[in-house]
Amino acid sequence: MNAKVEVGQPAANSFFAANLADADPEIAKAIELELGRQRHEIELIASENIVSKAVLEAQGSIMTNKYAEGYPGKRYYGGCQFVDIAENLAIERVRKLFDCQFANVQPNSGSQANQAVFLALLQPGDVFMGLDLAAGGHLTHGSPVNLSGKWFKAVSYGVRQSDHLIDMDAVEALAKEHKPKLIIAGGSAYPRHWDFARFRAIADSVGAYFFVDMAHFAGLVAGGAHPSPFPHAHVVTSTTHKTLRGPRGGLVLTNDADIAKKINSAVFPGLQGGPLMHVIAAKAVAFGEALRPDFRLYAQQVVVNAGTLASRLVEKGFAISSGGTDNHLMLVDLRPKQLTGKAAEAALGRASITCNKNGVPFDTASPFVTSGIRLGSPAATSRGFGTKEFQDVADLIAETLDGLAKNGEEGNAAVEASVKERAIALTQRFPIY
């Protein structure tokens, strides 16, 4: 005879009440260690930022429990009236933020937002143009290892060897030769402004859509510290983290009603099923934050700080690709120092300064080694770093890398330890969480 097992109230209470440290101490420990890293390292990865406590609360909310296939007012599940509020707020706020007519806030990432544009506007085998990954573009802009380069015919444009700037005459010549259906402006490591008006004129001349991927500089656009892709672009995508300082995710914007309809169908049901409503709620919070006056000050300071970091590094004898930066990021070419990006990233990491190895224009080193590093100002600016702090950061970077060049990895421990002590002291003046 089988004993009857009843689910008792104490067990249910335990499920809903147990905190993470009790329920899963291993994950809790990993989070604790990561918090310590974020608190005590100077974060210079250009694609990273630090979100507000409010964004964290929204993303960790009970909105994660709700399935909501479809769009506000047109869901395939019941009980969506409150998640509809969150998504409608996200749409309303992001439209206001970028002064555009239509927005889809459901993409789970910038890559999926870009895929939605391809699905909406292209057919397999169609030709499109984007910045070469080796010149600062992005995987999703036609890299042969990415879906965009496998399903479509990608024609890449590059930068001039003389100044590492995009040669718009060369872009125009390529467009006239290949007759693309779509032209992309945007990248992951291009430190200068984009000539949106010229790109649109070139696109119009060959009957192409003009698509801007502003994942890296969206927050700067929102804060009035970078030219807007509107009214030039037919369609715009972005991530919601990076300079926009929200949760990890994507979005698509347009002023064209027909394109908006195609984008909505491409996102759902074309690419995704149920949207992540807890993330969309967090996006709404971040968009609301970005509409406030203090975000404009933040965006402007991001640009000032990046310029300060770049100019100080030049003073210290480092080569900066294109000679500087107009936005939040820069590429440091380490070939004159006879260093690799891989070695520099590791040395700076040991000194409590986080960055990423990155190829530089016309790099001959492998992507796993590289001849440069990419640096960005958004996260440290969120902490409160100003121009003086970024001058200090540049000095710490120079001291570490000059020591590495002189002493080698095995002989640079004392320099790295000294820099680490000062880097941690700097972070402690600007605490997070």
Swiss-Prot record:
InterPro entries the UniProt entry points to: PyrdxlP-dep_Trfase (IPR015424), PyrdxlP-dep_Trfase_major (IPR015421), PyrdxlP-dep_Trfase_small (IPR015422), Ser_HO-MeTrfase (IPR001085), Ser_HO-MeTrfase-like (IPR049943), Ser_HO-MeTrfase_PLP_BS (IPR019798), SHMT-like_dom (IPR039429)
One Gene Ontology term from the biological process aspect of the record: glycine biosynthetic process from serine
UniProt catalytic activity: (6R)-5,10-methylene-5,6,7,8-tetrahydrofolate + glycine + H2O = (6S)-5,6,7,8-tetrahydrofolate + L-serine
Compartment annotation: Cytoplasm
Chain's role: Catalyzes the reversible interconversion of serine and glycine with tetrahydrofolate (THF) serving as the one-carbon carrier. This reaction serves as the major source of one-carbon groups required for the biosynthesis of purines, thymidylate, methionine, and other important biomolecules. Also exhibits THF-independent aldolase activity toward beta-hydroxyamino acids, producing glycine and aldehydes, via a retro-aldol mechanism.
Record-given protein name: Serine hydroxymethyltransferase
Enzyme Commission code(s) on record: 2.1.2.1
Molecular function in Gene Ontology: glycine hydroxymethyltransferase activity; pyridoxal phosphate binding
Complexes and interactors: Homodimer.
UniProt keyword annotation of Transferase present: yes
Any Gene Ontology CC annotation: cytosol
Cofactor: pyridoxal 5'-phosphate
Organism this protein belongs to: Beijerinckia indica subsp. indica (strain ATCC 9039 / DSM 1715 / NCIMB 8712)
Residues recorded with modification N6-(pyridoxal phosphate)lysine: K242
Family in the record: Belongs to the SHMT family.
